[in-house]
Structures are given as C-alpha cells and as structure tokens.
C-alpha cells in the first residue's frame, strides 16, 4: 500500500520508537518538470501512477511505502541494516522504474535519484535526521546523469 506523507511518516516514527531498524530510501523523478512541460500534466500523472505500481512491486508487503508529494517517494524497509543488503533492493527499484511502460512517453526512460540512509536498532536520532541523511544523498545523486543511488555513511561507522 502507498501511504500519504502523514500516515507513512507516522508509521516510520512508530517503527523507530519501537527499536525497529532498517533502510530508509528517498527518491524522486529526474526532470519531472520536463515531463509535465513536454507531455502534459495528464502524462505526468500517469508516470506517478506507474511509479506507484513499480514501487509496490519492488518492496515487501511489510515495508512502509509513501508518496511524500509531487514526484518524491520514500520507503522504510525494516530489517535491512547494511549497504550490502540494501543495494539489491535499490537496484530493483531503479530497474523497475526504468522499465515502466507509459506509452505516451514514446519510449522515454524515466530516471530517479535515490538517497539511502540506515537506522540501526541502537541508533538514537529522530526521523527528521534520518530523512535529512537520505535527502542529502538524493541531492548528491541528482548531480549524475541517469538513475543513481547514493548511500549515507555515518562517520561513527568508520
């Protein structure tokens, strides 16, 4: 199920408060404004619906998936604590979105910028900090061409 921002963030906060660790994935569509400008908002809406379907296929049933607004989405995957465990999930996400079929796009591939941060069960910071870490990674990913993911590394992890 795709949660709205309020519902999804509340569920993630509850998971963090209960000591549940996991991977927080934040992503948005590259050049979404260009899709709306060149193909129309109706096609942009179809892209968002297709992304919602692709995201639901990528993540597990117990994962918390949310649309934050506009072209920004997020997911929290309980029990995935490392880059090694998270990379295959992120690769599936990118591949699933790139292979979406939106006929009105005439074969154009939709790319996403992805930021990933991990929350360990013994971490003691807020959802806002977790979001900030993933958001800074999404910003770094936007600097590349095409779909790209950046993983947050906490200095304390080294």
Predicted regions and their residues:
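A structural signal for short, well-ordered beta-strand segments
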Residues: 24, 73, 112-116
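Catalytic-core segments of nucleotide cyclases and related cyclic-nucleotide turnover enzymes
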Residues: 91, 119-146, 156-157
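Inter-domain helical "communication" segments and dimerization helices
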Residues: 84-86, 96, 100-104, 145-158
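Residue-level recognition of strand-loop junctions within catalytic nucleotide-signaling folds
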Residues: 37, 76-81, 98, 119-120
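Catalytic core regions of nucleotide second-messenger enzymes
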Residues: 67, 97-113, 142
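Conserved long alpha-helical elements within nucleotide-processing catalytic cores of c-di-GMP signaling
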Residues: 1-23, 30-60, 66-70, 74-75, ...
């Amino acid at each position: 199920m795709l949660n709205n921002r309020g519902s999804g963030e509340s569920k993630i906060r509850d998971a963090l408060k209960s000591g549940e660790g996991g991977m927080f994935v934040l992503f948005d569509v590259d050049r979404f404004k260009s899709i709306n400008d060149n193909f129309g908002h109706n096609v942009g809406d179809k892209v968002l619906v297709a992304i919602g379907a692709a995201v639901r296929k990528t993540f597990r049933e117990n994962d918390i998936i949310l649309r934050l607004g506009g072209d920004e989405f997020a997911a929290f995957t309980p029990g995935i604590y490392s880059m090694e465990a998270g990379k295959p999930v992120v690769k599936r996400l990118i591949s699933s979105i790139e292979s979406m079929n939106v006929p009105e796009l005439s074969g154009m591939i939709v790319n996403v910028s992805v930021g990933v941060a991990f929350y360990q069960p013994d971490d003691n910071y807020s959802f806002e900090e977790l979001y900030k870490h993933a958001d800074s990674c999404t910003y770094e990913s936007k600097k590349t061409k095409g779909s790209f993911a950046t993983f947050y590394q906490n200095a304390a992890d080294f």
